[in-house]
A protein has these predicted regions:
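Short, cationic/aromatic linear interface patches
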Residues: 271-315
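Electropositive, intrinsically flexible nucleic-acid-contacting patches
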Residues: 1-274
Length: 315
């Protein structure tokens, strides 16, 4: 089955990534288990810098790459060049993904290699691929997320690209772990981090008599990447409108249902406290807080329904 690029194909800066990189047990999954985070990050940057030439060649500008990797403001030029060179060697020696030549004080020359035959140059995939948006680097998520969250973000992008219910898609942790050669713990950790950062939404199925251990994630929804500076501006607006104490209290409630980075939900909680009183709102969130993380009722919709139910019971 050939999966073609969708409507984001014309967006400058989007990066084409093959499913092979994620599924091949010798590549991304191995980087995850070996904690080769910087090699993982650098390889994605190399794909970003690749212009599609037939030789797989890239001129590696250290300053530019260091900026993408979040190293430029943290290290001297000598420091980030050394770190990048170390990751280049890992990509060559441990993963057979590249070949390269270094020149003192100058840009490096890198050649991407084929996944199937390292003796041949890399070529952009014609099927079974997906796109990582430029905002992943532009907004700094490439250096803000944990390694597990980065991997899970790519999984989300890959699956939503083949989903008939886009932007929603479905799978279990067990299936994902087996397919991508990483632990179920890494899947859970990465997905939960993305959920709490408001980068994905998650719905869980209702066990209907089955034990919670048999629960599967019903579906995941990829949400648009936002600029962290935008989020801070939204908090400033709410702080100005309602005061810091009310904002902080609402964010604490929102955290119970993993919406502490969603300004709309936080403001709605503030308004609910105004309309129904803190006692009612607190009771509803206390009920939700007793649910397991993977319980379908550990969500803001359930809290709102609980508040409404309590209000109807006491007209």
């Amino acid at each position: 089955k050939g999966i073609k690029i969708g409507e984001r194909a014309t967006v400058e800066g989007d990066v084409v990534i093959s499913w092979e990189f994620l599924e091949n047990p010798a590549l991304a999954g191995r980087m995850q288990t070996k904690h080769d985070e910087r090699a993982f990050d650098l390889y994605l940057v190399l794909l970003k810098e690749f212009d599609g030439n037939s030789e797989g060649r890239i001129v590696l500008n250290y300053e530019k790459v260091a900026s993408y990797l979040g190293l430029f403001d943290k290290m001297t030029e000598e420091g980030y060049r050394r770190q990048i060179n170390r990751s280049l060697r890992k990509l060559k020696d441990d993963y057979n993904l590249i070949d390269f030549e270094l020149y003192y004080g100058k840009d490096a020359q890198v050649r991407l290699l084929s996944y199937d035959d390292p003796k041949r140059p890399y070529s952009a995939p014609k099927e079974w691929y997906f796109q990582a948006p430029d905002e992943y680097w532009k907004y700094g998520w490439s250096s803000k997320l944990s390694q597990s969250a980065k991997f899970c973000y790519l999984i989300n992008l890959a699956y939503v690209n083949i989903s008939n219910a886009s932007p929603w898609w479905f799978s279990s942790r067990e299936v994902l772990a087996k397919r991508f050669n990483i632990s179920e713990w890494a899947i859970s950790k990465g997905m939960q981090e993305l959920r709490e950062l408001n980068l994905i939404d998650v719905l869980y199925d209702n066990p209907q008599g089955r034990p919670y251990e048999s629960r599967l994630a019903k579906s995941y929804k990829v949400l648009p990447l936002y600029e962290p500076a935008w989020l801070e501006l939204e908090w400033d607006k709410l702080r100005l409108a309602y005061g810091p104490k009310r904002l902080d209290a609402a964010k604490r409630y929102a955290k119970i249902v993993f919406k502490q980075n969603d300004p709309q939900v936080v403001e709605d909680i503030i308004l609910s406290i105004d309309n129904f009183g803190n006692e009612v709102v607190k009771k509803a969130f206390d009920i939700a807080a007793k649910k397991r993380v993977d319980n379908s009722k550990r969500c803001y919709e359930y809290v709102k329904a609980t508040i409404e139910k309590m209000e109807n019971a006491n007209p």
